Amino acid sequence: IAEFTMMGILPYVATDLGISIPVAGHFISAYALGVCFGAPMLLLARKRPLKQILLVLMALMIVGNICASMAPDYWVLLLGRFVSGLPHGAYFGVASIVAGKLADKGKSSEAVSIMIAGMTVANLFGVPLGTSLSHTLSWRATFLLVGAWGLITLYYIWRWVPQVEGLKDTGFKGQFRFLKKPAPWLILGATALGNGGVFCWYSYINPMLTNVSGFSAESITPLMILAGFGMVVGNLISGRLSDRYTPGKVGTAAQALICIMLL
């Protein structure tokens, strides 16, 4: 929710802070920049217990969103978004390892997809809820909601996630050894281009639907629920298929489907 909620409330934030929608888009970029800077933090914490890392990262997310909810101006909100983005990549990386290790034999891909489904469920329920809160109350209530949900998640991690053995430490340089092969670069490139293309339009989905497509402000919530539903279904299906077929085949089929739908 912390990542995607800004897309639905962008016009409300821009109006309240007295800035244009393109300038308000910097808050999305700040989060993404935090993700880029935060992911390498795993290199420094690679010897720490995985559960401890998850707790620290979740606490950092809570701080960032509480800061965003109380931001009096553009710069403080920009800082809050950056801080809340710092744990994003590292959190999903560690959580994927934990999910894979806790899964039954042959079910690791499905387990990871269920964990990642939290991000798609956020699009199904969290983002529309944030949009509705901003429309009826205030955009600040949305970030307060994310912070409160983070506190609940923090408790559940502490209470229910067992201590899991991490991956074998190969040293600082060993973390980059896989980049000597071309396959990781192709995956990184495809991910960058794919996500970049999605965020080019999804970041401004609210003003595009209202100002360009002519939808009313009240219709944004159900439209975003529909988009989120598609993400949830696609994520769950791909997780099951990845345990049966090679990732290359699943990825190729998914990209082909996207191209067909765009046509």
Question: PLM features: residue spans?
Answer:
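Extracytoplasmic
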Residues: I1-A24, A39, W201-N206
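Helix-breaking motifs and short loop linkers at transmembrane-helix boundaries and internal kinks
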Residues: G18, M70-V76, G214, T246
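Helix-to-loop junctions at the C-terminal end of transmembrane segments
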Residues: G38-L50, G234-T246
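Structural signature of the two symmetry-related core transmembrane helices
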Residues: Q52-C67, K249-L263
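Paired small-residue
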Residues: G64-C67, W75-S84
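Helix-loop-helix hairpin linking two adjacent transmembrane segments in secondary transporters
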Residues: Y74-V76, K105-G106, E110-R159, Y204, ...
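Cytoplasmic helix-loop-helix junction between adjacent transmembrane helices
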Residues: G80-G118
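Extracytoplasmic gate region of multi-pass secondary transporters
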Residues: W185-I225
